[in-house]
From Swiss-Prot:
Subcellular location: Plastid
Region of interest: Disordered: 1-22
Taxonomic path: Eukaryota, Viridiplantae, Streptophyta, Embryophyta, Tracheophyta
The name this protein goes by in its record: Small ribosomal subunit protein uS11c
Subunit structure: Part of the 30S ribosomal subunit.
PANTHER family: 40S RIBOSOMAL PROTEIN S14/30S RIBOSOMAL PROTEIN S11
């Protein structure tokens, strides 16, 4: 007789870390990845385990509106809302990417009430590495 395979819940059913096993997180790391087309905000604990995340796409913005500063602000607010409920007091902010949502996401994080220990820019900059692609002619 065939074994029944337990159903694995999808991400839409609930956030990771939600439910009965909510742990207190006094200090965390907020990663903001801002590209020209989207902004992804991930909140981890100090060891790097993901507690909550959100992006402009999951916040309801589609198409070109995902790259706007308002979409980045909404994504940052959605990602931080769950960790504030879990008791996060202090956080480090690591920002990566050249997108428009960098400043808007940082402004939303500052308004959330979490004390920021430092803000670091980790945007990758080539030291004359690979040749960039040719310029577009429109």
């Amino acid at each position: 007789m065939a074994k029944s395979i337990p159903r694995i819940s999808s991400r839409r059913n609930g956030r990771i870390g939600s439910g009965n096993n909510v742990r207190r997180i006094p200090k965390g790391v907020i990663h903001v990845q801002a590209s020209f087309h989207n902004t992804i905000v991930t909140v981890t604990d100090v060891r790097g385990r993901v507690v909550s995340w959100s992006s402009a796409g999951t916040s309801g913005f589609k198409g070109t509106r995902r790259g706007t500063p308002f979409a980045a602000q909404t994504a940052a607010t959605n990602a931080i809302r769950t960790v504030v409920d879990q008791g996060m007091l202090r956080a480090e902010v690591l920002i990566k990417g050249p997108g428009l949502g960098r400043d808007a996401a940082l402004r939303a994080i500052r308004r959330s009430g979490i004390l920021l220990t430092f803000v670091r820019d980790l945007t990758p900059m080539p030291h004359n590495g690979c040749r960039p692609p040719k310029q577009r002619r429109v």
